[in-house]
């Protein structure tokens, strides 16, 4: 039987599949070889042959499609014939997206099958996503259209919105109509020949997506809009079968596995489209995506096994490979957002591998937990610019079923000029040790230590300067050197920059970067803040001591030790210490009446007087007699402030001061002190009798 030839043309580029005659049952053998790559995982994503007649089949997982297979070729003569008849009138829903004129090519889940053939079908899942290609940058230009199938050959029809199929036998049409965004899975195949091309996407055991939606608005690169829901993270692997040597070169692009609804991939590569000759691949070759660096893969730009990202609408994620492009500005109203991540295609690890040996599927999640993003789930805006300085590279090992896949993500927090790498994973302790020993790391620690020292002395120096610190060399030496610039830490995540700035009296601003970032500890900062108030009082007290010594400089009677003994709080407890002898040093003679009342209320009423019997026995009494002295020389009673009259009882204390007898008795009952000289009024000690 003469073989049929199927051609899929895309403008100037064409993808040719040429198959020879097949009379054996080699299709089954080839699919068995393919299943050896990961039988356990493929059986979760493939449906049985008995279920292949359904036009719109649901996947095994809820709203998840884990496998896409496409096969072209001639029907084998040994296949079953009872399953092909249901595909002659197979229909599908196409989604047409408005906007952007004729510069967008819409590729929805398109199913093309030549009519008039009775080939048995295999399980093929054509869940192609909606793809938009900018005409001004992309070398491949296309109009809105669908695939036309004319007999044995298929090609892309540019101008139309209808899907036509003209077969040799019966003719069937698949109409394209606008539908809602509800995504439906389409299962089908054209033949069971194993010489056709297909893409096999497998889901890792430990991979999962956190539901969320993203909006991608780059100037160039990869633009993604829609919702990502329960798709695999990281890279995907595809199996490329044999192609004839005569097949032309065709661009190999990575198709990201996703079970989202209406995911839009806009590819605007600024460089030339790299091609890969299919003849260089052998049967069963495992291609690790991305193959060419110019192909921007969705899955390699999203973090593989990094964190569960909750991407909310209105946030941007930009991928760019053009180093000369303008950075994307952060929209207003996003002041609470974190600094952006920058993802580019510059640091990319990929290639081809002929090894299909099984490897472990467990993902090294511990490597990704030590990154600068805290927590397992993080709501983070992702604004990226195409230009970055130095990249903080952290490799995450991704092991997919029976294929070793490595991904190197390039992450950088925005900064001014210098990019500081975040703490690496625990597996690279050697690299972290070398970073700690680097001159840059040591310089940062030295600068922060200097800032801590200056913050402790900043307020002290300022107060000393305001309070005549120039007169005292001791206080002048405590002040930091006068300089117009000071180093102030600026917050910026792992890319914290050191800038020259006027030194602030309030001290430097430290941004707490987390436990993993080396910085000034909080106890030290609290000590610096508490020392400001204490240092102000200390400076004031020291100024008073020095002023007292200066005033007494001529007499040379007062020493520094004497002053410090009188006010020892300067040397010991400072402002927070309790001086229990403070009340004894009060100058009550120079206090006002209001101050004395306040002092009395604070001290309280303490009875230190004597009883009436002691007063009667100890108080000397006499009658007042006027003398020849002038009335101006006579003093009134100090207690009642009344003048003495002739014959009044007078009481005399041991100090010799006289008062009205009744007045001094009441006084002594309260306080056994002389109201005038403050000495002991009555001696209560028993006197020895003289024999």
UniProtKB/Swiss-Prot annotation:
Residue stretches of biased makeup (Low complexity): 407-419, 454-465
Catalysis: reaction(s): S-ubiquitinyl-[E2 ubiquitin-conjugating enzyme]-L-cysteine + [acceptor protein]-L-lysine = [E2 ubiquitin-conjugating enzyme]-L-cysteine + N(6)-ubiquitinyl-[acceptor protein]-L-lysine
Pathway(s) served: Protein modification; protein ubiquitination
Bias type Polar residues, positions: 204-213, 317-328, 395-406, 429-440
Keywords: Metal-binding, Transferase, Ubl conjugation pathway, Zinc, Zinc-finger
Region of interest (Disordered), residue spans: 71-91, 151-235, 316-336, 349-373, 395-501
Annotated Gene3D superfamilies: Zinc/RING finger domain, C3HC4 (zinc finger)
GO MF, any single term: zinc ion binding
PROSITE patterns per the UniProt record, alphabetical: ZF_RING_2
Tissues where this protein is expressed: Expressed in stems, flowers, green siliques, cauline leaves, seeds and roots.
Purpose: Probable E3 ubiquitin-protein ligase that may possess E3 ubiquitin ligase activity in vitro.
Name of this chain's protein: Probable E3 ubiquitin-protein ligase RHG1A
Lineage, opening ranks: Eukaryota, Viridiplantae, Streptophyta, Embryophyta, Tracheophyta
Annotated gene: RHG1A
